[in-house]
Amino acid sequence: VANTKSRDMVWADQLWFWIVAYDLWNMAYCYNCISTRAMYAGFALLVSCTFAEFFIKRGIWLQHRAQTLALFGMFSLAVDYQAMPMFSITATYNPTAWTVLSALALIFNAAVFVYEVCVIVKTKRNPLKKEMFTHLPAYRKNLEANGLRAE
């Protein structure tokens, strides 16, 4: 929990490469599985929390994601926006776009996984018990942005 007035939920170990990997995977999933809603359920939701993480407050992407997802869920369950012409977006249903986005997501996520395994082996840290990326400047910046210090 942040040591600031906001008392934000902090996950300092959730760094930019993990966030980008998740965003790519989630967008690929939305575009492949719910194409008609991918613009809203995927792109808009992901951009909003990722923008907030990179440009408003660092280290609390998970909280940004939970809040934007909750607001979108309440809105989409209360308003049938898909039936309104002004919200209508026709998906391309383009197999090339699906494949490229999915391949990019798979490659980026595999790279993050390999990097995480390398860090685990090199530092002998158990990711279930200790934070993994304490050696990176981005980790320290996430802590500092929330009034916290490394232990």
PLM regions with names:
Residues 41-149:
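C-terminal transmembrane-bundle signature of multipass membrane proteins
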